[in-house]
Every structure is written in structure tokens, then in C-alpha cells.
């Protein structure tokens, strides 16, 4: 998931005069020697095709693409081979018992600069600092922010200070660091990358927690300068989850959020070890390989899909349906939000999607099948469109433009993001949570389960046909949903889940949730009400899908404990700490 928030955009915009400036294809003043892509390459990246129909009558499935090889070599950590649905992949397990290897992984690094204090910034800065202290390393973790900003004060409260040399100005921190973790908002990265690159030391390492910047550069025919390495470590969850599970796992050899890692360019042979060290220091239970391009496509797509936008659309659509059909508001909320974020998520997390179906009675299975059959292809239609909007660069441009609308310009007012939890449904949710017994996971409501699992399976199928690895597919479609994000909606509602995430994720959820709500209401639910027959081929394919075995393998690698989101959570975004139930 993207590792940024809009507060960082404000910090960068105040420090740079390049914000919102049209981007040129070359930068003579700083002589950064960008690699320019050929017109043929650019056209190839933007091409859109259609493929086989998967037996559907309305929607063609995405064309099948063969996964790229993601093998890697490390001289510091142990690489393990896993088999996921017949595909061999490689991972590195984490754990506090590996912290003593961090000095070797970070060889040649004296200072790690963490730029930004949004969703991921606080978590990553604190986790890295604490892990390096435990490893008895003298590497300095320094946070770079705009002086005088509210974020500067928040970083002080987290134990970083100018006096200790662990807090400073953005640009001096970039210039003085050997590894720079760029965790500002994606739109701020897109508007300020020229200045950022010019401040990096030669042979330093630029670390990203999202491949968005690569996607933006590709969309304008550019690549990174060749005088520094570029790596990525991308936690599969929001920043507050990364920190919370790290703290919870201190007594049990660590727990945290799984991460993907990628090496885009390596100027001196250190990049893989540094990336894996970064991931282990964050507390990742396991780390799997990807590329920056595959990461940004799956990540931006995933958060608009089942991770945030789609699940929001599902519960809005079903709550409205249930109440219109005579169900009480409280029960409708329990049978939508509480069901998905409680028992359904818990079951999928520990036993997989098939266990949800198998836990139902025979009548319950029929309700599940009816909902699944009617929802699968409408869900895929929007998911397919969303993926291709991301892959073509359209969604990336949308994020950049939205970030610029946060500020007054061209005589038009600023348009910050609005609230998403002020409707009747979410007020009902406050009442339901206020009387919910501790540990209550809600009812396993078959129809809701059928729609939710259909969305999850449709997302898996799109990513599979687009050539993503099973580890990436399962993390972006299943694990992040049930282990990192849904627990936050269970705790305090949809805004507490969505708005603890990055700016890119928050924008995408707001944009795409209504699309899923609409298509479910207009197509899936209408099909159910009209008595459309259950597509037994879809049900058979679901029951026998090889992804279930792959999920079981990944479940064995999940965090060693479940995330706890208490009422007085102090590890979330400050503006969300004092919200109501």
C-alpha cells in the first residue's frame, strides 16, 4: 500500500518552488542524465488489449501474461523457496533474532533519512530506530520534515530531535543520508522529483515504499538518474498497522506486516542486501520479491479494489438493500460491516476463503452461491477497468492532478478530501459498536459473504491474468485486507480504515467505491431479484481454484498474532485519535 499522506505534500510544497510546475523531459541545470524511453516503449506501456472470456457472456477476462522471474541473491539473509499454486517463489523470513544481521545488510550506511511523516513515515522511522538500537548499530535514523510544521512537533514527541541529530530539514536530511526513504505523498514526489534527485549523494540509495514515482516517470518517458541505486520495500498494510504489530510482537520474536521488495537499479551491488535489511528492520514476517512496476500496478489497483474502495462499495450497497427489504438498521450493519470485518475476515485470515463457504449450512451455501454468481462478473468489470487505468498511467495522472487541487490555483478554491462516514449507515455503526460485546466478531451472513468473496476472487483473477506473482496477488487481495485493513473498519468504521492510509489510497477509495456500489446495485442485485440462475461453473471454479492452496501456504507465514486496535489508539493519524465510535 502507498506510503504517504497529504500532510507531507504541504511540507514539500512549502520547501520547493517547483510544485505544480509542468515537467520538462530534460534537466540541464542539474545535469541528472535521465534515461529517456523510446516512443515505441512508451506506446507499448500504454497499450490495452483484451483476451479470453473465461466463459462469461458480458465481460472478457484480462489477457494472460506470464509472471516475470523474481529470483534474487543475498549474502546476508537466508533465502527460502516456496511453492504457491505450482509456482516457485523465494522469500526471506523476518524476526528479531535476525536484527544482529542488520549492520552487515546496511554496510556502508551511516545515516538513514526518513522523509515524510504521514501514514508510513512515523512507523518506519520508529521501527528502524528501535531495530537498529536492538542490533547495537550506530547507524543514525534521521527524520526530514519542514521546520515549524505540525509533523515536526509530532516527530519530536516520537523521540526524534535536532539536538540528537535525528530530526532536521527535508533537504539537509536528503543530502546527508546514505539511504533516503522517500515517504512523502505520491503527488508531491511527482511534482518535486527533480529537486529531490539533485540533493541525493552520488552512490547513495533511494528507497521507496511504493512504485508510484516510477509509474509517473514512465508516463512522461523518463527513468531514474543512473548515479544512485533505487530500491523499494512496500509493507502490505497502512503505517499504523506496521507500527502496531511491531510493538505487539516485541516479546515473541517479532510480528509485523509482510512486505514486498524490489531493486530497480543497483550501482554498487549493495541494493538487495540493503532492501532486505530495511524490510527485516521494519518487522516484516516475510518479504517477497517484486518489481517496482508490478508493485505500483498491483498496489494502486488493490487499494481501489477489495482493500478499500470495493469493500466500502459492498457494504454501502448491501446495507441499503437489507434495510429496504425490512431489516432493522442495527441488524443490517451487523450483517454487512460487522460480518465482513469480523468473522469473515478472521476465517479467511486463518483458514482461507473456502472455509467461509464450508462453514455455512446447506441453505446458507445456496445464498452464498446466489450472491457470488450474480456478483463475480460485475465486480470483475470494474476491477478490470481499474487495473487498466492504473497500467495505462491514467490513474497516476488522476492522483497527481488531485494533489494539486488541494491548493488554491487559477482563481479556483482548494478542494481537500471530504468526510466519508457522515451518512446514516455510519451513525448506526457508532451505535452498534457502542453496545458490541468485547471480542464479538459478528454474524456469518451468507449473502454478504458471497458478494465479498466474489469481489476478492475477481481481483485475484485480474491480477493472475495480468502476470503478477501469487505472493503479490495474495498479499494485495487477501492478507492486507483481512489482517491489516478490515480490523480498522471493525474498530471504528470506514473512515478509520481509509483515512489512516496514504493520500493515493484515500483518493482512490473515494473515487472507486461509488463505482462498485453502483454496479452491484444495478447489475448483481437486480440479477438476484429477477431470479437469474446460479452459474454452477463459477461455483465449481471457486471451490477448486488453486489459489486456496497458495493462501494456506501464505497463512503459515502470517504475523504471529492478530492486530489489536484499541479504542484509545495512539498509533494512528493524529486527527483520527479522538474520533467517536
UniProtKB/Swiss-Prot annotation:
Binds 2 magnesium ions per subunit. Residues 1-50 form a transit peptide. Mg(2+) 2 binds at residues 299, 476, 480. Keywords: Amino-acid biosynthesis, Branched-chain amino acid biosynthesis, Chloroplast, Magnesium, Metal-binding, NADP, Oxidoreductase, Plastid, Transit peptide. NADP(+) binds at residues 113-120, 146-151, 185-189. Its cofactor is Mg(2+). The active site is at 210. It is found in: Plastid, Chloroplast. Residues 291-439, 440-576 form the KARI C-terminal knotted domain. Substrate binds at residue 502. Its EC number is 1.1.1.86. It holds the Pfam family KARI_C. GO terms for biological process: isoleucine biosynthetic process; L-valine biosynthetic process. Residues 92-290 form the KARI N-terminal Rossmann domain. It catalyses: (2R)-2,3-dihydroxy-3-methylbutanoate + NADP(+) = (2S)-2-acetolactate + NADPH + H(+); (2R,3R)-2,3-dihydroxy-3-methylpentanoate + NADP(+) = (S)-2-ethyl-2-hydroxy-3-oxobutanoate + NADPH + H(+). GO terms for molecular function: ketol-acid reductoisomerase activity; metal ion binding. Belongs to the ketol-acid reductoisomerase family. This is Ketol-acid reductoisomerase, chloroplastic. The gene is PGAAIR.
Amino acid at each position: 500500500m502507498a506510503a504517504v499522506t497529504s500532510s507531507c505534500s504541504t511540507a514539500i510544497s512549502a520547501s520547493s518552488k517547483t510544485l505544480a510546475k509542468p515537467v520538462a523531459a530534460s534537466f540541464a541545470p542539474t545535469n541528472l542524465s535521465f534515461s529517456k524511453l523510446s516512443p515505441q516503449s512508451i506506446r507499448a506501456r500504454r497499450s490495452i488489449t483484451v483476451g479470453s472470456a473465461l466463459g462469461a457472456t458480458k465481460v472478457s477476462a484480462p489477457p494472460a501474461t506470464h509472471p516475470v522471474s523474481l529470483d534474487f541473491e543475498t549474502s546476508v539473509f537466508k533465502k527460502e523457496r516456496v511453492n504457491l499454486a505450482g509456482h516457485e517463489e523465494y522469500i526471506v523470513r523476518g524476526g528479531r533474532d535476525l536484527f544482529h544481521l542488520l549492520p552487515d545488510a546496511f554496510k556502508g550506511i551511516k545515516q538513514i533519512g526518513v522523509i515524510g511523516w504521514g501514514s508510513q513515515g512515523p512507523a518506519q522511522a520508529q521501527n528502524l530506530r528501535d531495530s537498529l538500537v536492538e542490533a547495537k548499530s550506530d547507524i543514525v535514523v534521521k527524520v526530514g520534515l519542514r521546520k515549524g510544521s505540525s509533523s515536526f512537533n509530532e516527530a519530536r514527541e516520537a523521540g526524534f530531535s535536532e539536538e540528537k541529530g535525528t530530526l532536521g530539514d527535508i533537504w539537509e536530511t536528503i543530502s546527508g543520508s546514505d539511504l533516503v526513504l522517500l515517504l512523502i505523498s505520491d503527488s508531491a514526489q511527482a511534482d518535486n522529483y527533480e529537486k529531490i534527485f539533485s540533493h541525493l549523494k552520488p552512490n547513495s540509495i533511494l528507497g521507496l515504499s511504493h512504485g508510484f514515482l516510477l509509474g509517473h516517470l514512465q508516463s512522461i518517458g523518463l527513468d531514474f538518474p543512473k548515479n544512485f541505486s533505487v530500491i523499494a520495500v512496500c509493507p502490505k498494510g497502512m503505517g499504523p498497522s506496521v507500527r502496531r504489530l511491531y510493538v505487539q510482537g516485541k516479546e515473541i520474536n517479532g510480528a509485523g506486516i509482510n512486505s514486498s521488495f524490489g531493486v530497480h537499479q543497483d550501482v554498487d551491488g549493495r541494493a538487495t542486501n540493503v532492501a532486505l535489511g530495511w524490510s527485516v528492520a521494519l518487522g516484516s514476517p516475510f518479504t517477497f520479491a517484486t518489481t517496482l512496476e508490478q508493485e505500483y500496478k498491483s498496489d494502486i489497483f488493490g487499494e481501489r479494489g477489495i482493500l478499500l474502495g470495493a469493500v466500502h462499495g459492498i457494504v454501502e450497497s448491501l446495507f441499503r438493500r437489507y434495510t429496504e427489504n425490512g431489516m432493522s438498521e442495527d441488524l443490517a450493519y451487523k450483517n454487512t460491516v460487522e460480518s465482513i470485518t469480523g468473522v469473515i475476515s478472521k476465517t479467511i485470515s486463518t483458514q482461507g476463503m473456502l472455509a467461509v463457504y464450508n462453514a455455512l449450512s446447506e441453505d446458507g451455501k445456496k445464498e452464498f452461491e446466489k450472491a457470488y454468481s450474480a456478483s463475480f462478473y460485475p465486480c470483475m468489470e470494474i476491477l478490470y477497468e481499474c487495473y487498466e487505468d492504473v497500467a495505462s498511467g491514467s490513474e497516476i495522472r488522476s492522483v497527481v492532478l488531485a494533489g494539486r487541487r488541494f491548493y488554491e490555483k487559477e482563481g479556483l478554491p482548494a478542494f481537500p478530501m471530504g468526510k466519508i462516514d457522515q451518512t446514516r449507515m455510519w451513525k448506526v455503526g457508532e451505535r452498534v459498536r457502542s453496545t458490541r460485546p468485547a471480542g464479538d466478531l459478528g454474524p456469518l451472513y451468507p449473502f454478504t459473504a458471497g458478494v465479498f468473496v466474489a469481489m476478492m476472487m475477481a481481483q485475484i483473477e485480474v491480477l493472475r491474468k495480468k502476470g503478477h506473482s501469487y505472493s503479490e496477488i495474495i498479499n494485495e487481495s487477501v492478507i492486507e485486507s483481512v489482517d491489516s485493513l478490515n480490523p480498522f473498519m471493525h474498530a471504528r468504521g470506514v473512515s478509520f480504515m481509509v483515512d489512516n492510509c496514504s493520500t493515493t489510497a484515500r483518493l482512490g477509495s473515494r473515487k472507486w467505491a461509488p463505482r462498485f456500489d453502483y454496479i452491484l446495485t444495478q447489475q448483481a442485485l437486480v440479477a438476484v431479484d429477477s431470479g437469474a440462475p446460479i452459474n454452477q461453473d463459477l461455483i465449481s471454479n471457486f471451490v477448486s481454484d488453486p489459489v486456496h492452496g497458495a493462501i494456506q501456504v501464505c497463512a503459515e507465514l502470517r504475523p504471529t498474532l492478530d492486530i489489536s486496535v484499541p479504542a484509545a489508539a495512539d498509533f494512528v493519524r493524529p486527527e483520527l485519535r479522538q474520533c467517536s465510535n
